[in-house]
Amino acid sequence: MGTVELLTREGEIDIAKRIEDGINQVQSSVAEYPEAITYLLEQYDKYEAEQLRLSDIISGFIDPNETEDMAPTATHIGSELGEDDLADEDEEDEEDEDEDGDSSDDDGDGGPDPEVAREKFGELRAQYEVTRLSIQKNGRAHEDTQAAIAQLADVFRQFRLMPKQFDRLVNNMREMMERVRVQERIIMKLCVEQAKMPKKTFVAAFTNNECETAWFEYQKQAGKAWSPRLVEMDEDIQRAIGKLQQIEEETGLSIAQIKDINRRMSIGEAKARRAKKEMVEANLRL
């Protein structure tokens, strides 16, 4: 029989760093989703109002200058917890809080330092405001805005979020992407399956024009075999385009930006998941 090499300390550190790299990529991607930052700031406001424990939100902070032998951020990436599972965790936390008494008591010993948290959340809030104002003034594509977004991601990456908080932010972004996909599937089904527009023609017209109606108006008037059918489906297609426009308004992101954030988030999740699988397999050999 062959022998299986056991995981060395160096190998364990390498896997841990790859897990952390994947999670950092997810967290940096999520930082570009405005709702993620506002949600986290709202959670901290609840802590200050004594509605939450600080340890319900974060486990601590990462010093960007001290990354050696750093343990991976706690997260359920790889276990695919859904909203129902996260809700169950919330209920368990509430029960624990009732048993423990005052929600502010657990932050004194071993939990996050409240003073450091106040400073870090203040920094996050300030940078979020700088980024928001730059987007309003210059647009997301502007050089100054891109620099502000990068700085916001750097600040956000320093937060060690509790698993349920991290995963809720990821799930929120995933659900937003699913809303986009639902409307895109509706539009494609109407155009390709029912109106018989060639899929290649549809993809060329629709891609990067998801919230525009010009491509649709052109195809209706193009005198093609599918044009009369598109006219008949005008109301349904316009409704779906309107819902995509609503998503852009809600998020402050274009559909293309939502897709790009989701793509980078998915790549980071895959990296972390692969490294976690390696860690589990290595531990099973022991």
PLM region spans:
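Transcription initiation cofactors for RNA polymerase, centered on bacterial
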Residues: 1-286
